[in-house]
Curated annotation (Swiss-Prot):
Membrane-related topology note: Multi-pass membrane protein
NCBIfam families: nst
This protein's GO CC annotations: cytoplasmic vesicle membrane; endoplasmic reticulum membrane; Golgi membrane
Source organism per UniProt: Vanderwaltozyma polyspora (strain ATCC 22028 / DSM 70294 / BCRC 21397 / CBS 2163 / NBRC 10782 / NRRL Y-8283 / UCD 57-17) (Kluyveromyces polysporus)
Name this protein carries in UniProt: GDP-mannose transporter 2
Protein encoded by which gene: VRG4-2
């Protein structure tokens, strides 16, 4: 049995979709901003190590809370681990591609392009769960795509101008600028696969929030450590500049932030649906994007403003469409 130990009167809000959505919004803002702080240095090349530290902090925090009696979740066993391992592989792919995206893209552009994940998930739910996509939803998807194209245009121009000042006008910028879009595209598909498989596996295993959180992170540890050992430079010259006291402190803080996002992700998927979970993230992009303007690499131009507003509008349209579909199904 996995549970947050609360009183009888508090059980109502623990199972409330609106409370889960608000908690997910707050934790996703915290996670995005803390990861951007860590990844803002383009020379940072220890992504797997960063993700390993985040997952390790999350696992240690959970175990400490369990010992203190604040939370309860299933003990580790081989059967559950074997059933959940494919989800952990998807999680590693999702968080790695997310960290690489944040390394090359500004927070506003990153959050806008994450909208495209919703389209992939929506059609994934058609295949996996027999849901349908209506005309209003298609309209919101079209707005998401348009907002992403506008954001990409404004960000490209801003990035080229910034790189010209840094590297000189004679350097080719196409690879440097476009690599971020490759990583965000990979992240969209990895995120969709993770959410869809997790929802299906939760139905099979009857995992609760802390079970999901514990197994997601503990099974990721060997994968992340192996990835760091195989693909990252562990020489003293490379390791010391990236793992000094300031960077290590920020990594630990981002690990604590990952505790919140790990729990709230599983919580939100359990009490709502995987598409609603992703749509909330899309609606949440407005405060995330505005917060992202605190960073110097975020483009402040008309394209950025238009893309954010269009993306936000697409979220509202989608939410209305889902509400109408729910009301129609209740009438039948």
């Amino acid at each position: 049995m996995s549970s947050l130990k609360v009183s009888q009167q508090d059980k109502k809000w623990v199972n409330s979709g609106s409370v889960a959505i608000l908690a997910y919004c707050a934790s996703s803002i915290l996670m995005t901003i803390t990861n951007k702080v860590v990844m803002s240095d383009r020379t940072f090349n220890m992504n797997f190590l960063l993700l390993f530290i985040q997952s390790l902090v999350c696992v240690i925090t959970l175990l400490v809370l369990k010992v203190l009696g604040s939370v309860n979740f299933r003990s580790f066993n081989k059967t559950d681990a074997r059933n959940w391992f494919p989800i952990s592989i998807c999680l590693v792919l999702m968080i790695f591609t997310s960290s690489k995206s944040l390394q090359y893209l500004s927070v506003p552009v990153y959050t806008i392009f994450k909208n495209l994940t919703i389209i992939v998930i929506a059609y994934g739910e058609v295949l996996f769960f027999g849901s349908s996509v209506g005309n209003m939803e298609l309209g919101s998807f079209a707005l998401m795509i348009v907002s992403s194209l506008i954001a990409a245009h404004g960000d490209y121009l801003h990035s080229v101008e910034r790189l010209k000042k840094m590297l000189g006008p004679n350097v080719s910028f196409s690879f440097i600028v476009n690599i971020g879009y490759f990583w965000i595209a990979a992240n969209c598909f990895a995120s969709a696969l993770f959410v869809l498989l997790m929802r299906k596996r939760i139905q099979v295993t009857n995992f609760k929030d802390f079970d999901t959180m514990f197994y997601n992170n503990v099974l990721s540890l060997p994968l992340l450590l192996l990835g760091s050992y195989l693909f990252e430079d562990w020489s003293q010259e490379n390791l010391l500049p990236h793992v000094d006291i300031d960077n290590l402190s920020t990594m630990i803080i981002s690990g604590l932030a990952s505790v919140a996002i790990s729990y709230c992700s599983g919580w939100c998927v359990r009490v709502t649906s995987s598409t609603t979970y992703s749509m909330v993230g899309a609606l949440n992009k407005l405060p995330i994007a505005l917060t992202g303007f605190l960073f110097n690499d975020a483009a402040r131009n008309l394209s950025s403003a238009a893309s954010i507003l269009l993306g936000f509008a697409s979220g509202i349209i989608y939410a209305v469409a889902k509400q109408k579909k729910l009301q129609n199904s209740e009438k039948i």
